[in-house]
Curated annotation (Swiss-Prot):
Two Mg(2+) ions are coordinated by both the catalytic residues and the nucleic acid substrate to enhance substrate recognition and catalytic efficiency. The gene is Polr1a. The keyword Nucleotidyltransferase applies. It is an enzyme of class 2 (transferase). Phosphorylated. It catalyses: RNA(n) + a ribonucleoside 5'-triphosphate = RNA(n+1) + diphosphate. Keywords: Chromosome, DNA-directed RNA polymerase, Magnesium, Metal-binding, Nucleotidyltransferase, Nucleus, Phosphoprotein, Transcription, Transferase, Zinc. It comes from Mus musculus (Mouse). The lineage of its organism: Eukaryota, Metazoa, Chordata, Craniata, Vertebrata. Residues 1372-1493 are annotated as: Disordered. One of its GO terms (biological process) is negative regulation of protein localization to nucleolus. This is DNA-directed RNA polymerase I subunit RPA1. Belongs to the RNA polymerase beta' chain family. Zn(2+) 1 binds at residues 64, 67, 74, 77. The keyword Metal-binding applies.
Length: 1717
């Protein structure tokens, strides 16, 4: 036992947050600090300074003046700085601002309706007992009550709500347990936030009818107030009696009406006290956390103000000494600034008191200083203070004091200061802050770190430890009579000799260090190990020896980045003298993602028996064979072993007796006991053993004695084709794979056929090692790996060797000739590709083709250019395939298996076929970011090519090969591709790291409980069964039908290892089997029925005819005919029995057995899919058994029970931290996704967001406006639908003016008149494309375009020109005018603040980039963010410059269309979108007006509607052009009209279906392998598609916008969309993530019934404040927790870590109780 003082006897149960009151702080403070200098000239702390010794010693030399203890024992004491004037509390300043804004300064009441107040109080009260539903019920009661009674009084409302509330509170059974749950927390914070947002806006007071006063905050340090112009005084003010001692709060003076002034903290305080008097009963609920500790006292409004500042003890702001210089701590500097201000203010106040010039509210503050007024005051300090009069000086320094106080709390609050010292917020937040650096991650002892190097002779579960570490790392081992001998020897050896000891801990906890030089001391200690200590209080327990690590001790190894569970595993130590590095077996490299180019790893030595037990049993390498991401194996042998193994097991590899024995011995060096051997395969002329027999010998010796050896049929990685040298003779029914070397057959532990390669001992599924793991467990599979590694190494070392030569890469001469010919052909394919891409006629000349190519390259829309790229790639791909066919594999000089390079590639050792092709055939097409190398503006790809050259070489098609060398330009392309890979690697790490952190912080608490549900740490159920079937991913690998034969083949072993007989004797599957039978019976009966019929339905169908015949007369009642009523009556009159007959026939299908019977308790309760798999397999098995010659020993029933047992054994264990596993399984693969695998869309394809950007969109932002929204709907396969869908596609496609405009001609001239009459004249002629050009694609006619020009485009043009001018003038003269009365006009001002608020809200919702602020991303992010912010600022400046009417109109536009605003970056884009409402329907056909009169009228209309249009003409015949003359007043600034018109033309939308930009028809194959058409749209508008139900199969409509799906189809649909979207992102990169992880993440995100992101806005609903604070924006969450008075139950993992509790997960989920008897 450890000494008693280390034994914990108390545990934290919870933490609550609150604030100290002023009185308590005054009592806690030991000293008032008044001296701004903190050290004197000698560097000693000065009295009353910030390092006064009363606050505790600042370093080890001093003694505390308060408690007279030294630095180690005194924990420090608080002091305080008195402030001469009240200041705002920066912590609560924003709430104070809202309170003042939402209350009336005249009658001191809140301006929100009384109903809202009483409703909120009632809602918060019912939430205190966790009654969630009552919240919505209260809303309903209130709205009904308000409808019924016209204008109820506050008292009536209160009565009505109180009646319901009290009922709820009385019936409450849960007590306060229900309140710390996610849903309740979410609801509470939502209600309060909603209240602040809606009811705290400035509006007219409903009580005293005073106009609204506008409050603005500036720089977080002062409040500017604009008083209302009218004040209504009540005539009867006597009604409100004031209690004694409360000064009557000032109202609003006559003088102040309509003025604007500075609201001092003291007047704000008076006003707040007055509000509190009136509204305190309610505000106490809003600020429940700010109560003083006593239960009676309610919230204290003085919390919003500070009269003094608390000074933390000196030891928490130590002085940093560097040489003989002293550097002060940042906190001290901030406090010093406050003190300097306080001194100045005191002087100023004394001076003003003398001159009697104090402003009215200050008089009582300075009465006490009156007595010394006679003393003359030094006035020299006044020069330091800004401001003309003394009062101004006072106000200015007061504001300065306020901003210095702010800095103490948060240095970001003062935006103007340049050199910033960290405030309290900076100490807590970010990665370097207290929470994340010191509470969540702590440094540890008993750890080691060194470089790793490989070693294939140790076991896979071992780690080689150098002697340096072995003598430093120790383990505290209690001395007992059993181990005393060993420990004595260790003590005698001492700290430097291994195995020794470094220290002995005595019974009372004192430590004796063992001397390295004094052997006598060590012997003395060694002799007394078992003698009990003497002394008065007999200490209990035994001595403990800290002994060195020895062989077989367990160590935890870890390599950063620790991205998933296998990055930390437990290894057994093997001490290797003479080493300085850690030695790691090759097989573990993949798990750690380690290579040996200088990687370092950390080792940790667990210090308790519990920790060791967990490491040996759970974290051991043998148990980590499968990765939790998708259950694939991680450990596997590496390159040389593959080559060696494949060569060794090939037919025709023989060994003599000596060689056989040598190899077997090398493989089984550490086997204890006899080695079983095989008889030789060849007896004459002398005995020889095959390589396969060597492997078999190993296997039967490794498999545990009491288990049957394994049976396995599998495939090798080397395919059967590779072994075939020439064409085989035709044989009927010949299967080329059977008995071939690519088919691996193991029977009873003997390898009979096939080659062993990567597929069997690499990290690949269902190989030999995986099967051993499955049947015999991790220990055996680990030994198989170890022994095979030794064997294959020995084979290479002793007998074989492995090398590559030039001969392996040479190509036969005739193949070379073919290759040369194909390369020559390929140079001619360029023009063909461009023609195909741009669909040009065959006869087109080269110049014409080049011209078109140039147009495509330089045009803004890159689709055509991408198309050319794609066609080129297709062409050259064809050629590279031809070349490869000619040279590989038959064109090579040497063939497999003699060809060592091919052997290496085929067996999976290293390299790929691509590598061999690049060596022997050609390099192929070089690609950058998924496309050919880009062209320069001149049209060349590199300077050495012609512009727009047709040869594929110029586009990066390298026909050279490494064998014969490549040319400089080709080499350059090759290097470009190599560089791209490096860039990606560097950029993607920070992105994916932050993504993973977000997911982990959210899901960390999800753990499987003992009832198999997945719950969050507060007990809220996220899934009833993990992954919806409760299975553990690594255990499910062999539950696939393909692996059933393997399980059947090894029935004996599995039955024994899984204890089948014991299970069957205890578990009775009858209940479940009966249930399954019932389900099958129901399905059998109702197989044909699509619709379920109810009992009454079948009854009415039966008697319908009879009732009709009665011809009943009568009227329809409630929409029911007399016949229906008659039938109802007859149904009610039926007797029980006959009605039961009908009901029985209509009984619903019973629930699946999994949902009725808990799978861990009831045997054979499996999921429906698995049940179906078992059924199918048993039928196959039975059919096979009938066909086969010998009868199988395995009966069908036994096979079924075996599979059911395997399923039950695969259930996930309680305590498994599935949330973390899911987070790691998404985060870890995301680091492998290269950032820039973009998908460049050609003309016929959709743009899709891929990779990490898409993952961030789904998981971290849950954004409502995604970058590439799309819908896809299959088209019905009927003639009618297929015909109509073409026109539908046309109708849904958006048309921009730029797409139908051929060219614009612009002529510019000047018209010079008198002074003011100078004009610029532009003549614009728009020429449109002929109708034939776009007839197929677009749903438009020329006259529609003309109409659009006249009605919309000219207006847009006018607005754009106006904007250009305003921008220009704004830049030219920076407006520096004084604020005029108009600015102060309250209507406009409030409008501004309203908008400002809205913008703030916007910013809240729109995380520009959460992590850039969080310090979690790289520098480039921060730069980019600053840039974004700069741009935002610019926009806001321009808005102000516009004329008001235009602004109003803009507002109108913007509000018009909600869907698009989110991601249109520039205001100008909205102008085009305005059209959207008008053009929902296809454009109306304007009949062309005939006759000169009509034409004139039309021209006149255009000229009249636009002031700046001088003249207008249009094509009256064809509507193919129009010409307009624009006359503008001459300005100093010139702008480019043509670029303006072009950019507008691209933005202006002639016709659109709201939300949809483009439509495509693609052909795909569906699940039944039938071809079908699918309509894909870019953009989303679900209701629009619902109109075409006869063309589109709406039941299979899909969209990638999760919010749209949730709003249309409900949250369960959104859940499936999230799963599918994440799966699709990974699928692009070929990464498989188990669907159970995805379903858990999706379930968590939709837990509250809405789709919430995994970022700091999503964590707001968490019930653990500590979890929120350790995530992001700690200060914000701390503030919230303090104000709400939150309580943390310390259940979430983060909270447990912060306070040092064991996390409630894994082995921490349960407690062990000792039986005391």
């Amino acid at each position: 036992m450890l000494a008693s003082k280390h034994t914990p006897w108390r545990r934290l149960q919870g933490i609550s947050f609150g604030m100290y009151s002023a009185e308590e702080l005054k009592k806690l403070s030991v000293k008032s600090i008044t001296n701004p200098r903190y050290v004197d000239y000698l560097g000693n702390p000065s009295a009353n300074g910030l390092y006064d010794l009363a606050l505790g010693p600042a370093d080890s030399k001093e003694v505390c003046a308060t408690c007279v203890q030294d630095f180690n024992n005194c924990s420090g004491h608080l002091g305080h700085i008195d402030l001469p004037l009240t200041v705002y509390n920066p912590f609560l300043f924003d709430k104070l601002y809202l309170l003042l804004r939402g209350s009336c300064l005249s009658c001191h009441m809140l301006t929100c309706p009384r109903a809202a107040i009483y409703l909120l109080i009632s809602q918060l009260r019912v939430l205190e007992v966790g009654a969630l539903q009552a919240v919505y019920e209260l809303e309903r009661i209130l709205s009904r009550f308000l409808e019924e009674t016209g204008d109820p009084s506050a008292f009536e409302i209160q009565e009505e709500l109180e009646e319901y509330t009290s009922k709820i509170l009385q019936n409450n059974l849960l007590g306060s347990q229900g309140t710390h749950v996610k849903n309740v927390c979410e609801s509470r914070s939502k209600l309060v936030a909603q209240f602040w947002k809606t009811h705290m806006a400035a509006k007219q007071c409903p009580h005293c009818k005073t106009g609204r006063s506008v409050v603005r905050k500036e720089h977080n340090s002062k409040l500017i107030i604009t008083y209302p112009a009218t004040v209504h005084k009540k005539s009867d003010q006597e009604g409100t009696e004031l209690p004694e001692g409360v000064p009557e709060a000032p109202g609003i003076d006559k003088a102040q009406m309509g003025k604007r002034g500075y609201l001092t903290p003291s007047s704000a305080q008076e006003h707040l006290f007055a509000i509190w008097k009136n509204e305190g009963f309610f505000l106490n609920y809003l600020f429940s956390g700010l109560d003083d500790i006593g239960p009676e006292s309610s919230f204290n409004p003085s919390m919003f103000f500070l009269d003094f500042i608390v000074v933390p003890p000196s030891r928490y702001r130590p002085v940093n000494r560097l040489g003989d210089q002293m550097f002060t701590n940042g906190q001290t500097v901030n406090l010093q600034a406050v003190m300097k201000d306080a001194v100045l203010i005191r002087k100023l106040l004394a001076l003003m008191a003398q001159e009697q010039k104090l402003p009215c509210e200050m008089t009582e503050l300075t009465i006490d200083k009156e007595n010394d007024s006679s003393v003359a005051i030094d006035r020299s300090f006044l020069g330091l203070l800004p401001g003309p009069s003394l009062t101004d000086k006072l106000y200015n320094i007061w504001i300065r004091l306020q901003s210095h106080v702010n800095i103490v709390f948060d240095s970001e609050m003062d935006k103007l200061m340049l050199e910033k010292y960290p405030g309290i917020r900076q100490i807590l937040e970010k990665k370097e802050g207290l929470f994340r650096k010191h509470m969540m991650g702590k440094r540890v002892d008993y750890a080691a770190r060194s470089v790793i190097c490989p070693d294939m002779y140790i076991n896979t579960n071992e780690i080689g430890i150098p002697m340096v570490f072995a003598t430093k790392l120790t383990y505290p081992q209690p001395v007992t009579p059993w181990n005393v001998q060993e420990l004595r020897q260790a003590v005698i050896n001492g700290p430097n000799v291994h195995p020794g000891a470094s220290m002995v801990i005595n019974e009372d906890g004192s430590r004796t260090a063992l001397s390295s030089v004094d052997a006598a001391q060590r012997e003395a200690v060694a002799k007394q190990l078992l003698t009990p200590a003497t002394g008065a209080p007999k200490p209990q327990g035994t001595k403990v020896v800290c002994r060195h690590v020895k062989n077989g001790d367990i160590l935890l190894l870890n390599r950063q980045p620790t991205l998933h569970r296998p990055s930390i595993q437990a290894h057994r130590a093997r001490i290797l003298p003479e080493e300085k590095v850690l030695r790691l077996h090759y097989a573990n490299c993949k798990a750690y993602n380690a290579d040996f180019d200088g990687d370092e790893m950390n080792a940790h030595f667990p210090q308790s028996e519990l920790g060791r037990a967990e490491a040996y049993v759970l974290a051991c390498t043998d148990q980590q064979y499968l990765v939790p991401k998708d259950g694939q194996p991680l450990a596997g042998l590496i390159q040389d072993h593959m080559v060696s193994g494949a060569n060794m097991t090939i037919r025709g590899c023989f060994f003599t007796r000596e060689q056989y024995m040598e190899l077997v011995y090398r493989g089984l060096t550490d086997k204890v006991g006899r080695v079983k051997l095989f008889p030789p395969a060849i007896l004459k002329p002398f005995p020889l053993w095959t390589g396969k027999q060597v492997v078999s010998t190993l296997l039967i010796n490794i498999i545990p004695e009491d288990y049957a050896p394994l049976n396995l049929s599998g495939k090798a990685k080397i395919g059967s084709k590779a072994w075939v040298k020439e064409k085989p003779r035709p044989i009927p029914d010949f299967d080329p794979d059977s008995m071939c070397e690519s088919q691996v057959i193991i029977r009873e532990g003997e390898l009979l056929c096939g080659v062993l390669d990567k597929a069997h001992y690499g990290s690949s599924a269902y190989g030999l090692v995986h099967c051993c793991y499955e049947i015999y467990g991790g220990e055996t599979s680990g030994r198989v790996l170890t022994c095979l590694a030794r064997l294959f190494t020995a084979y290479l070392q002793l007998y074989r060797g492995f090398t590559l030569g030039v001969e392996d890469i040479l190509v036969k001469p005739n193949a070379d000739v073919v290759r040369q010919r194909i390369i020559e052909e390929s140079t001619q394919c360029g023009p063909q590709a461009v023609k195909a891409a741009l669909s040009l006629p065959e006869t087109a000349s080269c110049d014409e083709i080049q011209g078109k190519w140039q147009d495509a390259h330089l045009s803004k829309d890159q689709r055509d250019f991408n198309m050319i790229d794609m066609k080129f790639k297709e062409e050259v791909n064809h050629y590279s395939n031809e070349i490869n066919k000619a040279c590989m594999p038959l064109g090579l000089h040497r063939q497999f298996p003699e060809n060592n390079l091919q052997m290496m590639v085929q067996s999976g050792a290293k390299g790929s076929t691509v590598n061999t092709m690049q060596i022997s055939c050609l390099l192929g097409q070089i690609e950058l970011e998924g496309r050919r190398p880009p062209l320069m503006a001149s049209g060349k790809s590199l300077p050495c090519f012609e512009p727009y050259e047709f040869t594929p070489r110029a586009g990066g098609f390298v026909t050279g090969r490494f064998l014969t060398g490549i040319r400089p330009p080709e080499f350059f392309f090759h290097c470009m591709a190599g560089r791209e890979g490096l860039v990606d690697t560097a950029v993607k790490t920070s992105r994916s790291g932050y993504l993973q952190r977000c997911i982990i912080k959210h899901l960390e608490g999800l753990v499987i409980q003992y009832d198999l549900t997945v719950r969050d740490s507060d007990g809220s159920v996220v899934q009833f069964l993990y992954g919806e079937d409760g299975l553990d991913i690594p255990k499910t690998q062999f539950l696939q039908p393909k692996q059933f034969p393997f399980l059947a083949g090894n029935y004996e072993v599995i039955m024994k290892s899984k204890h089948l007989h014991e299970v069957l004797s205890r578990a009775d599957p009858q209940k479940v089997l009966g249930h399954i039978k019932a389900i099958k019976k129901w399905h059998h009966k109702h197989s044909g029925a699509l619709l379920r019929k109810g009992a009454f339905l079948s009854f009415s169908q039966k008697i319908q005819a009879a009732v009709k015949a009665l011809n009943l007369k009568g009227s329809i009642q409630n929409g029911r005919s007399p016949e229906t009523q008659q039938m109802l009556q007859m149904w009610y009159d039926l007797d029980e029995e006959s009605r039961w007959k009908y009901q029985k026939r209509a009984a619903p299908c019973p629930d699946p057995s999994l949902s009725v019977w808990r799978p861990d308790i009831y045997f054979a309760s499996v999921s429906e899919t698995f049940e179906k798999k078992i059924d199918d397999f048993s039928q196959e098995w039975a059919a096979q058994a009938e066909r086969s010659y010998k009868k199988s020993e395995l009966s069908l029933d036994r096979l079924r029970t075996l599979l059911q047992l395997k399923w039950q054994r695969s259930l996930c264990d309680p305590g498994e931290a599935v949330g973390l596993l899911a987070a790691q399984s998404i985060g870890e693969p995301s680091t492998q996704m290269t950032l820039n695998t973009f998908h460049f869309a050609g003309r016929g394809e959709m743009n899709v967001t891929l990779g990490i950007p898409r993952l961030r969109e789904i998981l971290m932002v849950a954004s409502a406006n995604i970058k590439t929204p799309m819908m896809s709907v299959p088209v019905f396969d009927t003639k009618k639908a297929l015909k109509k869908v073409k026109s539908l596609k046309k109708r849904l496609t958006r048309v921009c003016l730029g797409e139908v405009l051929q060219k614009v001609d612009i002529q510019e001239s000047f018209c010079m008149g008198e002074k003011r009459n100078k004009f610029q004249v532009y003549e614009l002629r728009f020429q449109f494309l002929p109708h034939a050009y776009y007839q197929q694609e677009k749903c438009l006619r020329p006259e529609d375009i003309l109409h659009f020009m006249e009605t919309r485009f000219f207006k847009l043009l006018m607005e754009a020109i106006k904007k250009k001018k305003n921008k220009a003038s704004a830049f030219r003269n920076v407006n520096s005018r004084r604020a005029t009365q108009k600015d102060l006009n309250d209507t406009e001002d409030s409008g501004r603040s309203q908008r400002e608020e809205e913008r703030d809200e916007e910013e809240e919702g729109n995380i520009v980039d959460a992590e850039a602020e969080e310090g979690d991303a790289d520098a480039s992010d921060t730069k980019r963010k600053e840039k974004q912010e700069e741009e935002v600022d610019y926009e806001s400046e321009e808005e102000g410059e516009e004329e008001e009417e235009e602004e109003v109109q803009e507002e109108g536009n913007i509000k018009g269309d909600g869907v698009h605003q989110g991601h249109e970056p520039d205001e100008e884009e909205h102008l085009g979108l305005e059209e959207e409402e008008s053009s929902q329907k296809p454009p109306r056909r304007h009949s062309r007006p005939q006759g000169a009169e009509a034409i004139k009228r039309r021209i006149q209309a255009v000229r009249e509607s636009y002031s700046f249009i001088e003249d207008y003409q249009y094509d009256t015949e064809e509507s193919l052009w129009c010409q307009v003359t624009v006359k503008l007043p001459l300005m100093k600034i010139n702008f480019d009209m043509s670029s303006l018109v072009v950019s507008l033309a691209h933005k202006a939308i002639v016709y659109t279906t709201k939300g949809i930009t483009r439509c495509l028809l693609n052909e795909t194959t569906n699940s039944k392998n039938e071809k079908e058409l699918v309509l894909n749209t870019e953009g989303i508008n679900l209701p629009e598609l619902f109109k075409y139900s006869e063309i589109l199969d709406l039941r299979r409509l899909y969209s990638n916008d999760i919010h749209a799906m949730a709003n249309t189809y409900g949250i369960e649909a959104a859940l499936r969309v999230i799963e599918k979207e994440i799966k699709d992102v990974f699928a692009v990169y070929g990464i498989a993530v188990d669907p159970r992880h995805l379903s858990l993440v999706a379930d968590y995100m939709c837990f509250e019934g809405v789709y919430k992101p995994l970022n700091r806005f999503g964590i707001q609903s968490s019930s653990s404040p500590l979890q929120q604070m350790t995530f992001e924006t700690s200060f914000q969450f701390l503030k919230q927790a303090t104000m709400m008075g939150s309580h943390d139950e310390l259940k979430s993992p983060s909270a447990c870590l912060v306070v040092g509790k064991v996390v409630k997960g894994g082995t921490g989920l349960f407690e062990l109780k000792q039986p005391l008897r």
